[in-house]
Curated annotation (Swiss-Prot):
This is Small ribosomal subunit protein uS2. Keywords: Cytoplasm, Ribonucleoprotein, Ribosomal protein. GO terms for biological process: ribosomal small subunit assembly; translation. It comes from the Eukaryota. The keyword Cytoplasm applies. Pfam families: Ribosomal_S2. Component of the small ribosomal subunit. Mature ribosomes consist of a small (40S) and a large (60S) subunit. The 40S subunit contains about 33 different proteins and 1 molecule of RNA (18S). The 60S subunit contains about 49 different proteins and 3 molecules of RNA (25S, 5.8S and 5S). Interacts with RPS21. GO terms for cellular component: cytosolic small ribosomal subunit. The lineage of its organism: Eukaryota, Fungi, Fungi incertae sedis, Microsporidia, Nosematidae. The keyword Repeat does not apply. It is found in: Cytoplasm. HAMAP family: Ribosomal_S2_euk. One of its GO terms (molecular function) is structural constituent of ribosome. Disulfide bonds: none annotated.
């Protein structure tokens, strides 16, 4: 593959490393060996080459941008933690989301309730979304898939080598792909407002409850500290003689002071 003209931003490299998107599995399939950079000796985990991942991101974004109508691209994820990222990706790129259970015959049976006739298929995991990948091959769909080192890449046209077993890494991959698509279409900067990646990440309800409780504890602690500081300031003011309220000063004393000053 020719060297890409779009350099990968440092923020994207940090995002892939933090989300552990560069960490594959212990095993490697034959067709995924070309994307392996090395092996961690302690855990025996394969490390994916980020440069090759970036090349495939650009290739996938170019395929998406070649569509006349973005809704002709269908994004599928049967995993629970991949649904939010898919919905946010489709909101950003105007693609068609398919989340939850994939109904057999969606692509090749017109008798189903909501048949689809897309031109491009994007899946978060070719193993979990195997039914969609197989049906896409029957109707000659161009398939883009986020693949781990031990995935079978049969019927996949563009492989994006990335960790697809982590909720954060899948969300990071969809975020990067959406940014590339918007950059190619509108020229929007790639690394602008990187905090938007939080909108792609799935949060478990139990985890959200813990975060809310922690936030309440922090707020209560801040309120307690603020009240203590206010109390200490009042005590200091009273000791220094600053705690006299204006209402306690008589008007006669003020007028007498002003008369003496005039004289």
């Amino acid at each position: 593959m020719a060297k890409v003209n779009i350099p990968i931003p440092n923020d994207f490299v940090k995002l892939i490393l933090i989300s552990q998107g560069h960490l594959g599995g212990i095993k490697t399939s034959k067709l995924m060996e070309r994307y392996v950079f090395g092996t961690r000796k302690l855990e025996n985990i394969k490390v994916i080459d980020i440069e090759k991942t970036w090349e495939k991101f650009i290739l996938a974004a170019r395929m998406f941008c070649s569509l006349k109508h973005p809704s002709d691209a269908v994004v599928v994820s049967t995993k629970t933690f991949g649904r939010k990222g898919v919905l946010k990706f489709c909101e950003s790129t105007c693609a068609t989301p398919v989340i939850g259970r994939f109904i057999p015959g969606t692509f090749c049976n017109n008798q189903v309730k909501r048949p689809l006739e897309p031109r491009v298929l994007i899946v978060s995991d070719p193993f979990a979304d195997k039914q969609a990948v197989i049906e896409g091959s029957h109707v000659n769909l161009q398939t883009i898939a986020f693949c781990n080192t031990d995935n079978d890449v049969s019927f996949v046209d563009i492989v994006i080598p990335m960790n697809n077993r982590s909720p954060v890494s899948i969300s990071a991959g969809l975020f990067i792909l959406s940014r590339l698509i918007r950059f190619m279409k509108t020229g929007e900067p790639l690394d602008e407002n990187m905090k938007e990646v939080e909108l792609f990440i799935y949060r478990d309800p139990i985890e959200l409850e813990k975060l809310v409780e922690e936030q309440k504890i922090i707020e209560n602690a801040n309120i307690t500290i603020g009240e203590q500081e206010l109390y200490e300031q009042e005590e200091f003011g009273n000791k220094a003689g600053w705690g006299i309220e204006p209402s306690l000063v008589s008007t006669e004393a003020v007028s007498e002071f002003s008369d003496n000053w005039k004289n």
